[in-house]
Regions:
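C-terminal motif of bacterial Sec signal peptides marking the signal peptidase cleavage site
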Residues: 16-20
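Short, hydrophobic/aromatic-rich segments at coil-to-beta transitions
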Residues: 98-108, 159-167
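A short acidic-to-branched-hydrophobic micro-motif
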Residues: 102-135
Length: 219
């Protein structure tokens, strides 16, 4: 799992996101309190990145922001309350203790008979520790999963500012899974290629941080 904290200007984040460039260096998976900066060192933490219900929808990318083709978007879905844990389990295929709210949007290439498209999903948790624990469980699950289509291959991508992340690939599928504060982000792509998936992940991180900071990513 990759870990790191990067302050990025909004303009730079959007440029990087739309170009889909970068090749990160991998690190060992983070476990325990070391997964959340400041806890292991005993430092006072700044409030973590989080999103309210409106932000969970606003932070999801727009179809017009994907530049390699024309994409149509389904209506974004927001899940709250008792249904959230099931929605998280159904999407991530692992239990999600502490999950509070979920949102999701599908984007598909217009006029294509292929499966080219992307899915963006966000999950907020009560604490960074809860979000980090679910991300570690998810990474372990994906590395061990062996289905009819074969195993996933870990790949290196640059997230554009997530606290922790990992990415996997299988045939035309690339998935990027990230934690930004108390939010888990899930970006999966079909027929985008690794660089296209990386760009989609960076786009998601850029929008999320703008919304969490009280800004409008579409202004």
């Amino acid at each position: 799992m990759r870990t790191g904290v990067r302050g990025i200007a909004v303009a730079a984040a959007m440029v990087v996101a739309l170009t889909g460039c970068g090749d990160g260096e991998g690190t060992e998976a983070v476990t325990g309190n070391d997964a959340v900066p400041g806890i292991a060192e005993g430092k006072q933490k700044v409030p973590p990145v989080t999103l309210d219900e409106a932000g969970m929808i606003k932070a999801l990318p727009l179809s017009s922001e994907l530049t390699h083709g024309t994409y149509g978007a389904g209506d974004p879905v927001l899940v709250q309350g008792a249904e959230t844990a099931k929605a998280c389990l159904d999407t991530l295929e692992v239990e999600c203790p502490g999950v509070k709210t979920a949102s999701k949007k599908d984007l598909a290439l217009v006029g294509s008979s292929s499966d080219t498209g992307a899915t963006f999903a966000l999950f907020t948790f009560g604490t960074e520790e809860e979000a980090a624990a679910v991300l570690r469980t998810l990474e372990k699950h994906k590395k061990e999963f062996d289905g009819p289509s074969g195993r996933y291959t870990p790949v290196k991508v640059e997230s554009g500012g997530a606290d922790e992340w990992f990415a996997i690939e299988r045939k035309d599928f690339v998935g990027v899974y990230m934690r930004i504060g108390t939010v888990l982000s899930y970006v999966i792509t079909d027929d985008f290629g690794r660089e296209g998936a990386e760009g989609a992940a960076q786009l998601q991180v850029g929008r999320l941080k703008v919304v969490a900071g009280g800004g409008d990513p579409d202004a």
